[in-house]
């Protein structure tokens, strides 16, 4: 009877995962229709729905298991046998690696994230050596120009599954050929071999053709974002062929792609050649398997800890009033813990901070908000924690700590990609770097605002600079929707002495924001003020923000480009 119960539990979990991934593929498969219909609000809703599917199905399985087991508590040996039986179901299972993560999620939900040990759940994969030796159908098709690059591109683009007409396909092909010839020599292109993914990658208002360009043994990305005009006709907006550009397109600050992937591991391996700087966790996350991305992030952390002797330290930069942030000196992630008590000027609650981080997870991040992974009961060996950090943890988050003697448990934290704090970057920047940083910062604010996100606290310390020089927002405790804010002009003073008073001469409600005030706390430095006024002076005008609000209320969804505007074919034509 017991063995049958263990078998039933294992099969119930795997069937639950099958149901979840089936719904995942179903929502993903609708991406083409939503794109063709230009139903951008449905695109946003589908993105949120797909994110929620995972936790929903974990909850369904947990309820089934409680019914099956009559909510009995089982010993360690029983749980180990369930995992062993589940492992035995996976050798021929096509999505075994994500099925392992689903098992982990069910276990954590049942046992409140306690006793997270390798004998009870898949801290490490049961099949680390397994690769997809046989794939039911190829992920990509091969194309060789044979001296006729334009003809080959015509064949590739006409063969797409999209059912809309092209605005001017021959024009776009000419642009693509021009971009390729500018990037590579004739000698390189003589051996050109293209591999084009069968499935389009959908995100925001674009459908991305993703491919590889093989030249004399070297491999380059070949990325074409397809948009449509106001008449519903298709056009290609640019052609990207560098690994740095591809890395930004698949960046950690962007929403997940909608791409139909029955075999996600195979797609991850295929993408790895054009995204060599991306970790396994980042690749899974980029294609929408963010929960397995979380598993892989933890495994990458464990691998780093195993091969390193570094101690955890307080992260460089200005200490936050809401979050305690720490890192390892050469690790590319940071760890963020919500403080038990906030600074007096912070009028937020712990619950509100959690809501803000969830909002960011579900919202279109437009390349300007860092994705996070959330962990509970995170265990760290005490000898790996610097004395300064340990004292800080004990002072700022004692309610979230559990001391196990040689280890500490942090009850809740976020893991996030590490960046250089913008304020520190600006302190070391030369004039051109400073100008570029201010341009990027202003663009980040504007793109977030256009996506209905107001950062709240706009100080430079709340933004980071990526290795590609992009500015990304990462402090979410005051974030809110643009439509919730009342942007006001400062009323003129009634009397000359009003301007000298310590208190404002006008009433201020909780949601009131006065953009004129941004100038005072952002532009105390003369050079910063000059660059800001030159490139982003409109951010100091309440009318600019109210205009954006009106566009949002009118239902307008802004275009989001994962590349510079000057790279757009339409801009090249103007130049």
From Swiss-Prot:
The gene is aceK. This is Isocitrate dehydrogenase kinase/phosphatase. Pfam families: AceK_kinase (PF06315), AceK_regulatory (PF20423). Bifunctional enzyme which can phosphorylate or dephosphorylate isocitrate dehydrogenase (IDH) on a specific serine residue. This is a regulatory mechanism which enables bacteria to bypass the Krebs cycle via the glyoxylate shunt in response to the source of carbon. When bacteria are grown on glucose, IDH is fully active and unphosphorylated, but when grown on acetate or ethanol, the activity of IDH declines drastically concomitant with its phosphorylation. Its EC number is 2.7.11.5, 3.1.3.-. One of its GO terms (cellular component) is cytoplasm. The active site is at residue 371. It comes from the Bacteria. It is found in: Cytoplasm. One of its GO terms (molecular function) is phosphoprotein phosphatase activity. HAMAP family: AceK (MF_00747). ATP binds at residues 315-321, 336. It catalyses: L-seryl-[isocitrate dehydrogenase] + ATP = O-phospho-L-seryl-[isocitrate dehydrogenase] + ADP + H(+). Belongs to the AceK family. InterPro entries: AceK_kinase, AceK_regulatory, Isocitrate_DH_AceK. Its main location: cytoplasm.
